[in-house]
Amino acid sequence: MSYYKITDLENYFKMYKKSVREPRKFWDKIADENFTWYQKWDKVFEFDMQEAKFEWFQNAKLNITKNCIDRHLAKRGEKTAIIFEPNDPKEEAQHISYNELYARVAKFANVLRDQGIKKGDRVCIYLPMIPELAISILACARIGAVHSVVFAGFSSSAVAARINDCECKMVITSDGSYRGNKAIDLKGIVDEALEKCPTVEKVLVAKRTNTNVNMKAGRDQWLQPLLDDAMNTNVAEIMDAEDPLFILYTSGSTGKPKGMVHTTAGYMVYTAYTFKNVFSYEENDIFWCTADIGWITGHSYILYGPLLNGATTVIFEGVPSYPDFSRFWEVIEKHQVTQFYTAPTAIRALAKESLDYVQKFPLQSLKVIGSVGEPINEEAWHWYNDHVGGKKCPVVDTWWQTETGGIMISPLAFVTPTKPTYASLPLPGIQPVLMDEKRNEIEGNQVTGSLCIKYPWPSIARTIWGDHQRYKETYFSAFPGKYFTGDGALRDEVGYYRITGRVDDVVIVSGHNLGTAPIEDAINEHPAVAESAIVGFPHDIKGNALYGFVILKESGENRDRDNLSKEINQHISDHIGPIAKLDKIQFVSGLPKTRSGKIMRRILRKIAEGDFSNFGDITTLLNPEIVDEIKDGKI
């Protein structure tokens, strides 16, 4: 009996029990029967939750790209691996077969080696959603270089911080990128970032917008001529199961971003397994995840998960609103997409527009529709189910994180009965628990608490690059012996889970996790600002938006408030990127603080939400009178 594909609900419960009672046997069988290895493992896994140390498939040898590409060539060589759908619908889509993907990855891998990149070197990739992004990632994995993809919407200082943190030797970028009807100068952003990055020796530049850019002699080279001269075969590097595959930065609730390290074998096994089961993938399906590859969703479910299963995956360069709001539906129709995976923020934005946009396309090819990035609200769930899925496609509402590597709690299409707004049941191997404030596990159903996971799984991030102590403190100290997700959750009467939102200082805006601390740091660097505090508040489209409470220095007191608000948002945009801009800025004379100097954020959250009913005990505040002042000045 295959463990790899769950067939029905009874089979799910059977597999889930097996995965919990005999995890070594369960994962051993899945890894053994579905992947190509140079050498099998000595032990399936060993772990220490106190020290936050995890090893999976110990001493196994493999290369993930052989599993993504080479092993498919005999049977699926001419099958389309990647469909590239450009920003402009008038530009022709590209269909890249597995044979072509092999040749292009081999050439790119040879270029990297020729440029002095070796196993273990870090390479920063700052590219738009074009084929070169996927190919450069796979080329790094081919030669054992560690890829660190930075979302191409981040500012130069955010790029520099990420490059410096993991000491990248090379940057791969493009002359520019398209976003709707705008062209963006990516190379200019990289040039600015690299003024502060001493470790970068080489920059490879792909052509996308064909704009004039500065090329620094000795450092910058156009990519295409190098690829033209490279051989189209390449021997893959033999990697250890626990060798790092990539670093991906996620917002910290405190200070600098965290470089999550994912290693090779466990990540491979778990992303392949979850892709197959959550989306009920079958041969010849066309899978489209609308995320950017710069986020974990793109790594796991545009690239690695689909290719490991020999699937056809869509890479979409555009945005849902260009040239108009029918673009997603037009792409589904054009490429006969069978599984569609997007974010609630996109669903809400599209639901606001005329139904004509979606109704002019039959969307008969769709079998499964999915949601990712944040909990989906009931109204959006029903709109998505009714108008996109035609009430015949299961809605898989997936919960997971950058740190988890793959989907953790989700309905399995055609297996798990769905319930609006619920992520439902855990995947095999995942043991969620709810914890109370006294660190006790909450038993039974119809309860809420802090969501933790009490046993490791193959694709758990192994550490924060260069800072294992921070990794331990962030994820394993709040509830010793358990992984703390930072999310709150509710377990209903049948054991289904519903994510209720963050319980730390991270706000999810349009599906992006934004730590409040880095945004506050950016605001506080403005010469007119003394101090600031950021909280989230509900937003119809974005799910949450950011509300800033700002105290001005004396020098800023007489400044025009509208101009100051614009400058503050520009400051945030320059330091972090446009995604972190504030929707509302309220200038205040003080912030509610405890006697130890801690800002009482729950009060600010309530004010931002317009809920003045119960601020709880404010006698512990140093300045309780400030609460009324802030409340009265609410925007």
Specify the residue positions occupied by each region the protein language model found.
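Conserved ATP/PPi-binding loop(s) of AMP-dependent carboxylate-activating enzymes
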Residues: 425-429, 440-475, 514-516, 612
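AMP-binding/adenylate-forming catalytic core of the ANL superfamily
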Residues: 150-176, 190, 333, 340, ...
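AMP-binding/adenylate-forming catalytic domain of the ANL superfamily
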Residues: 202-207, 541, 574-599, 613-634
